[in-house]
Swiss-Prot record:
Subcellular location: Cell inner membrane
Encoding gene, per UniProt annotation: syd
Protein name: Protein Syd
Predominant subcellular localization, coarse grouping: membrane
NCBIfam families: PRK04968.1 (NF003439)
Length: 216
């Protein structure tokens, strides 16, 4: 089953929750990165958060190039989860704790995401572990949310280790179990690597990157 209907509904509920509770759109620190998601004026040198809303992409993003580069078919949900929208990360509450779903802020962010997916999969191969790809983070500790590439199930994964706890049999069921979390925007730290300057993806997986690529 495609994860897109569940993602569509969560995005709708997400923005409605902010409008109902706060009377405004969610806010986000773009850190100088433009995006079609931005509502209102945008100044690249501003350090203030902006209002945003998701925008469906004119051309759906694809990971076919990643599949070819690694000679590895990816579970189809990756194209839908990351390729349909431009969006800021999505905060959530769940029975597993609070966390966030990663999304893509702009075209450059998508390219950086692809690079990081490749790096993650190469590290899994190096460690002789089954392939996975990430969809987000839990706020507690260094817990990534990853997809088992063989069957599409959702798991908790600690960087450098195999998946440890299955949360859902599918990405659809996992998203359907989440509730939007209303919270003020948080300004993420800039990382000291040029490839990580894009806030939509890399500033939100700081711990994962440091664990994966600090142990090469």
């Amino acid at each position: 089953m495609s994860c897109l209907p569940a993602l569509d509904k969560f995005l709708q509920n997400y923005h409605q929750a902010y409008l109902t509770t706060l009377g405004e759109l969610p806010r986000y620190y773009p850190q100088g990165e433009p995006s079609v998601c931005i509502q209102g004026e945008f100044f690249a040198d501003s350090d203030k958060p902006i209002a945003w809303q998701p925008v469906k992409r004119d051309e759906v993003g694809s990971f076919t190039n990643v599949e070819h580069a690694l000679d590895l078919p990816l579970w189809p949900d990756i194209h839908l989860f990351y390729g349909q929208y431009f969006s800021a990360p999505l905060l959530f509450d769940s029975k597993w704790g609070t966390g966030e779903l990663l999304q893509v802020w702009n075209d450059d962010d998508f390219k950086c995401l692809q690079q990081n997916v490749i790096g993650h999969l190469m590290m899994k191969k190096k460690l002789k572990q089954p392939p996975t790809w990430f969809i987000g983070l839990l706020d507690e500790g260094d817990k990534m949310l990853t997809i088992n590439n063989s069957d599409g199930s959702v798991w908790i994964e600690i960087p450098g280790e195999e998946q440890s706890e299955q949360l859902s049999t599918s990405l659809t069921a996992f998203i359907e179990a989440l509730s939007p979390r209303i919270a003020p925007p948080v300004k993420h730290e800039e990382l000291p690597m040029p490839a990580l300057d894009h806030p939509g993806i890399f500033a939100n997986i700081k711990r994962m990157w440091q664990n994966l690529f600090g142990k090469s």
